[in-house]
Regions:
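A short, flexible N-terminal coil/short beta segment enriched in small residues
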Residues: 3-15, 49, 58-70
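Generic structural signal for well-ordered alpha-helices
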Residues: 47-50, 75-79, 104, 128-133, ...
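N-terminal cationic-hydrophobic initiation segments that often serve targeting/anchoring roles
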Residues: 51-54, 82-85, 108, 136, ...
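Radical SAM enzyme [4Fe-4S]-AdoMet core and its adjacent flexible, acidic
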Residues: 113-238
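Core AdoMet radical
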Residues: 32-41, 56-71, 82-101, 109-128, ...
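Canonical Radical SAM [4Fe-4S] cluster-binding loop centered on the CxxxCxxC motif
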Residues: 4-44
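N-terminal [4Fe-4S]-dependent radical SAM core
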Residues: 1-14, 228-238
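Short microdomains enriched in Cys/His and/or Lys/Arg
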Residues: 43-55
């Protein structure tokens, strides 16, 4: 029998830190931007809870919202969380990228990976390009192009600009799902689906030392977890 184990003993915690958001996207679940749940006034109990959860293991903390960067103490929270434990704490977060370029120029939190969702109902392509330019040499930076059916041309143009740049970023396109989990919204064509599988992969994950969540030990050898899935070697019979 083959033995599969994690290549590093990590855990992952996803935290919806706030439902305060400056966007009101039509396809976003209402409870994620209802502005009812603000960030904690005192975040040290949150750090204590996180460290109890990890039980000494290396930990990935994925922070979402709402919009996390609206929290005035977001950067200091990240710094204090990393400093609170001797083992590795890898912080990731998702943002709509709406803060000013000046904000991102000054951003210095100990983040291992930041993901930006480009929402065509509000976001500006030039602004997004400039924040990617500000961050790509300092952070592992991903951009997800959220593509409603009527924005294919705009998404293609922005994707092409990013692809032709020298920015060390990852870019992927996401088709919009109903927020109640009933599948994709109506209006997508084969052209949309063909475009949605295109990827830009240029971060190389070389800015910081991250916890490796993409590989496992398979009979003692480190291999890609996705390769196991693709070849159905992750499936077992009773």
């Amino acid at each position: 029998m083959s033995r599969i184990s994690l290549s590093e003993p990590w855990k992952k915690l996803v935290w919806v830190a706030t439902t305060v958001c400056n966007y009101n996207c039509t396809y976003c679940a209402p409870n994620l931007h209802d502005n009812k749940n603000r960030w904690p006034e005192n975040y040290y109990p949150v750090i204590d809870m996180i460290n109890r959860f990890r039980k000494g293991d290396p930990l990935i903390v994925d922070i979402t919202g709402g919009e996390p960067t609206l929290w005035p103490e977001f950067e200091t929270f990240c710094t204090d969380l990393v400093d609170s434990h001797k083992n590795k704490t890898s912080i990731q977060f998702t943002s709509n990228g709406s803060r000013s370029v000046r904000y991102w120029d000054r951003f210095s939190a100990p983040i291992d990976e930041m993901a930006f969702s480009f929402h065509t109902e509000y976001a500006d392509t030039e602004h997004f390009y400039q924040i990617a330019k500000s961050l790509h040499l300092r952070y592992n930076t991903k951009i997800f192009l959220m593509m409603p059916p009527n924005r294919l041309t705009e998404m293609r143009e922005f994707y092409d600009r990013l692809e032709q740049s020298d920015l060390q970023i990852d870019v992927a396109t996401k088709l919009i799902k109903h927020h109640d989990g009933t599948g994709l919204v109506d209006g997508y064509t084969p052209e949309h689906h063909d475009f949605s599988v295109q990827r830009i992969n240029r971060t190389k994950y070389n800015k910081v030392k991250t916890i490796d969540t993409s590989t496992v030990l398979y009979n003692g050898d480190k291999i890609s977890a996705q390769d196991l899935i693709n070849t159905k070697q992750d499936q077992f019979l009773n």
